[in-house]
Amino acid sequence: MSASSPNLHKRFEPYAAGGVVALGLALLATPAIADLKLCNTTSSRIGVAIGYQDPTGWTTEGWWNVAAQTCETLYKGALSSRFYYIHAIDYDRGGEWAGKSVMCTADKSFTIRGVQDCIRRGYKGTGFFEVDTQEAKDWTIRLTDPSEGGAKPK
């Protein structure tokens, strides 16, 4: 080998470094996956409804049917609110995960704008529990069995 061989290697280092920088920038440009997910850690099938506030007001949506030991995405994309509200029903053993925040639901699949006057508008007034995402851009909720503080009998 000649004495100039090490210089040949050094001439290509900037190109290799540029490739690494370009790859890094491409990875940074890839959108991050950010969603609100719910995992059913119980042995039952459950039905789930969600409530949230966006710039146009309050919305409730349902029902997601979530099999035992699986997860579902309830809200796709970066979370726009700090607080989300959940109501879930245990289809197999009865009981529900509920709370004090009353929002509108329906028996069949629904998207309802607004949370006022549910019954007068032909919907049910249903108790939802609050989930504080602490302003994270994605969050996973885990519903557990009653023995672990999960669904309460109706």
Question: Would you name each region that the model predicts?
Answer:
Residues 23-31:
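C-terminal segment of classical bacterial N-terminal signal peptides
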Residues 30-39, 43-77, 88-154:
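Intrinsically disordered, low-complexity segments enriched in small/polar residues
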Residues 3-19:
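Bacterial N-terminal signal peptides that target proteins for export
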Residues 19-20, 58:
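Short, functionally important structural connectors and interaction interfaces within domains
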